[in-house]
Amino acid sequence: MKNNIVIITGITASGKSELCDNLREKYGNISIINCDSKQVYKEIPIITAQPLKQEEFYKLYGYVSAKENYSVGLWLEDLEKEVNHALENAQIPIITGGSGLYISSFIKGLSSMPQISQEVRKNVSELRKNLSKEEFYKLVLSKDSKVQDKICINDSHRLSRALEVITETGKTIFVWQENRQPPLFDNFKIYTILPKREDVYQKINSRFIKMIENGAIDEVKKLLSMNLAPNLPAMKAHGVPEIVKYLKGEITLDEAIQIAQTNTRHYAKRQYTWFKNQFPSSEVIDCANELTALEIF
């Protein structure tokens, strides 16, 4: 075995789950460990495309309540236990998913990020909602000039986070990111799946239709019945906000589907740029089938 731990990451709908299934069938002694921040929630297996899991092989999927504000720090604690358990039982841990913050924190160590007050979060959220994309970007740059070279104008989530941090602390988010805890492990190999965009966009569109057919609307109904705060992570999973609007009568089902597909495609586009620049040691694979054929262990 070349590396004790394998990381398989990549953009959404790139075939990571199917690849892990194929590798498990090929090698057998594998523990597949989730690093998708939304696939941890047990109430939304369909809309987050969780694998049809067998507990002995799939770990950290669908085990957290949607009521919880699960964090990367908690995930790292759970991950460490699962990786060690796999190694102790002569299994190969495969960490897989597309949450960039989770992957980055595993590889580089967890950043000591500050707590952000609810008041600051609310104010930034209102600004993001009420300003145009260009106006919001200009505002963030006026507070933190370092953003210009590091965050693109279309990445509203990271721009909001940067504005929250500098508003709360007076320091740029990039200073906080440099202050990291040591990584949990260093004996890993990372592969990044970046297929052709057209193929991914087509899969995103068809996959969301299948989610609707398989019961995604009922999942979101259950979330609404739980009276969850709209800022909880589970309520922000791709497709959930759009279906919520449909269930409240604000848009039609066709509109909800189209908007969710568009938003997910935009997310995939941002992921392309992010993954290409973040992990220089990663081996980039165009197609998941290529990796299945490789002798990666």
Curated annotation (Swiss-Prot):
Keyword Isomerase carried by entry: no
Gene expressing this chain: miaA
Family annotation (InterPro entries): Dimethylallyltransferase, IPT, P-loop_NTPase
Family per record: Belongs to the IPP transferase family.
Residues the entry annotates as binding substrate: 12-17
Record's function text: Catalyzes the transfer of a dimethylallyl group onto the adenine at position 37 in tRNAs that read codons beginning with uridine, leading to the formation of N6-(dimethylallyl)adenosine (i(6)A).
Name by which UniProt lists this protein: tRNA dimethylallyltransferase
Sites annotated Interaction with substrate tRNA: 99, 121
